């Protein structure tokens, strides 16, 4: 039994190393593709016709998704290897919200989704967190909200303070999540049966790991037909 456990740990470690290595190797060529596409968009190599512009946009969207997946895989390997490095600093919640909006604005415009902000600044304190990681979580949650929303709809991102807890939340008004899956959606690689939205099944799992590494919680409130609300709770 001890031998089997040792072999399992070695295999798991090898898997983590392999995924990390492949993800690093993929980032460079994908980034190069993105840079080349940007040159095309800026018309530095000539003007594109309509068909070429559509093709360029399609390649860029796919490349961006690949880049997101490699980022998710790298984050996952850090968590699994116990090498998650935290660099906390004093951060205003609005800075995290603004980062998430900026990162998702193009996607929101694509589907004509209105992003609404709820932020009573005078009533909210500051956080001592790794701003890069919490911003990543909010960005992922907002991206999901947009992708699961109806076209021409709206999503809400905001913050509020309850005692010594600051809540950062993202809400959509899409189809919602079956209560049976409210816990499972935070599992690695889990995908809600029947969903048509593309994804790796890693984003929410990594988000939960990042939040819990700060001593916080990430939860979901959802009702079928009415949408979903994801809430990050952190100590102020």
Predicted regions located by residue number:
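Short helix N-cap motif at coil->helix boundaries in the Bergerat
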Residues: 93, 176-184
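Conserved catalytic submotifs in the C-terminal HATPase_c
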Residues: 53, 87-92, 109, 114-125
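Short alpha-helical segment of the dimerization/phosphotransfer core of two-component systems
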Residues: 61-68
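Short alpha-helical Gxxx[C/S/T] motif in the catalytic ATP-binding
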Residues: 203, 207
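Primarily the dimerization/phosphotransfer
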Residues: 5-45
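Helix-loop junction within the histidine kinase core
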Residues: 77-88
């Amino acid at each position: 039994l001890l031998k089997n456990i040792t072999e399992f740990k070695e295999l798991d470690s090898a898997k983590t190393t392999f995924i990390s290595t492949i993800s690093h190797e993929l980032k460079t060529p994908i980034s190069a593709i993105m840079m080349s596409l940007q040159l095309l968009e800026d018309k530095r190599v000539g003007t594109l016709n309509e068909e070429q512009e559509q093709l360029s946009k399609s390649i860029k969207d796919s490349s961006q998704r690949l880049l997101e997946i490699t980022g998710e895989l790298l984050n996952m390997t850090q968590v699994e290897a116990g090498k998650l490095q935290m660099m906390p600093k004093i951060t205003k919640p609005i800075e995290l919200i603004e980062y998430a909006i900026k990162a998702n604005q193009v996607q929101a415009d694509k589907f004509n989704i209105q992003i609404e902000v709820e932020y009573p600044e005078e009533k909210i304190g500051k956080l001592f967190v790794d701003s890069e990681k919490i911003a990543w979580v909010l960005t992922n949650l907002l991206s999901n909200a947009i992708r699961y929303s109806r076209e021409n709809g709206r999503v809400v991102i905001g913050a509020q303070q309850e005692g010594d807890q600051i809540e950062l939340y993202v809400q959509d008004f899409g189809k919602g999540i079956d209560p049976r899956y409210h816990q499972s959606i935070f599992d690695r690689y889990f995908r809600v049966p029947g969903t048509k939205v593309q994804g790796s099944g890693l984003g929410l799992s990594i988000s939960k790991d990042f939040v819990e590494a700060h001593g916080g919680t990430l939860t979901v409130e959802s009702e079928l037909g009415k949408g979903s609300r994801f809430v990050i709770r952190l100590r102020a």
